[in-house]
Amino acid sequence: MSVADKPFVRTSILAAEPPPPGERGAVAWIRRNLLATPKDVILTILALALIAWAVPHLVNWLFIQAVWSGPDRTFCATTLQGGIQPDGWSGACWAFISAKYDQFIFGRYPLGERWRPAIVGILFILLLVPMLIPSAPRKGLNAILLFAVLPVIAFWLLHGGFGLEVVETPLWGGLMVTLVLSFVGIAVSLPVGILLALGRRSRMPVIRMLCVTFIEVIRGVPLITVLFMASVMLPLFLPTGWNVDKLLRALIGVSIFTSAYMAEVIRGGLQAIPKGQFEGADSLGLGYWQKTRLIIMPQAIKLVIPSIVNTFIGTFKDTSLVTIIGMFDLLGIVKLNFSDANWASAVTPITGLIFAGFIFWLFCFGMSRYSGFMERHLDTGHKR
């Protein structure tokens, strides 16, 4: 047998070759994403021109020409407006934010009692951070403390009683109200939404009809209407002398509205589960609730994590609508302070809205990034 007729047997593994020079690095990314076609080149040039024009103006207005400290509006107004700045001046009035910062966070909460919401915030962070870390131990205990124990402690600290001065909810406001509304809405909407989604897929006609009616009615009206009904119409159906706290009405309205949307998100995840998963669970002899808890629901939630977090983000932003029922969240308390004569100037409203927008963006961006992290962490599917 000649050498040419012998079968080839590899005795060593060749080292991996690096990719071609033009396929990696920043230059390759720019060529592939920004300069791939003539249309991309034109759009890139226009975008760079817009950035080159806007960024210096924004930096100048937000930082260089900005007023960082001052006792009143005169530091944020020109001489023609009764201030000390030269005519033609324009810049952010961060002194307004600095002077009203405590009110933006706590609303009209009594100054001497603001240590109470501060403690609630610290407890919330201490319980939330381990909950967000996938590898953290004792998740069950952590969840009980966060969603069952903390609300009781928070209500006692924020509202008062049992030795603490009572602070009525009309005095609450600012970021504190935004976080309370969004946390309760999110914490209630997920389990209620799961039950509604399961009820809508139920084989029992009465339960299915009730869930479908609830979901479609709530989804068919705007949140403003739900809040108005909860605030104005709900007391009309209560016995004489009964009075439901305004904040509680808002919490009920936000929770109901978010639950209806969450139910449709969860239902979409349930419909995406292959039929074989249901049949496999049945073949193991699992009951309905065992099958749902152990096999079906974990997969459904994993599939719709982006939509769930998107609903959470929408809930956080929708809390600003409570101003129509006389409550002042972060945005509402910022806008309320525009009428303060001591800080009335042309740049005060713009600065206040930028501050509120940045706070909202910070929370929403954090939720979005965590959603992406959880998607990657739970991406256990088999890909070809």
Swiss-Prot record:
What's a BP term from Gene Ontology annotated to this protein? amino acid transport
Please give the organism: Rhizobium johnstonii (strain DSM 114642 / LMG 32736 / 3841) (Rhizobium leguminosarum bv. viciae)
Ordered alphabetically, the record's keywords are: Amino-acid transport, Cell inner membrane, Cell membrane, Membrane, Transmembrane, Transmembrane helix, Transport
Q: Specify the protein name.
A: General L-amino acid transport system permease protein AapM
Q: Which family does it belong to?
A: Belongs to the binding-protein-dependent transport system permease family. HisMQ subfamily.
How does this chain sit within the bilayer? Multi-pass membrane protein
Q: Name one GO cellular component term.
A: ATP-binding cassette (ABC) transporter complex
Query: What domain of life does the UniProt record list for this protein's source?
Result: Bacteria
Which SUPFAM superfamilies does the record cross-reference, listed alphabetically?
MetI-like
Enumerate the transmembrane spans. Answer: 44-64, 117-137, 144-164, 179-199, 220-240, 250-270, 319-339, 347-367
Q: Which residues form a coiled coil?
A: none
Occurrences of domain ABC transmembrane type-1 (ranges): 175-364
Its gene?
aapM
Signal peptide stretch:
none
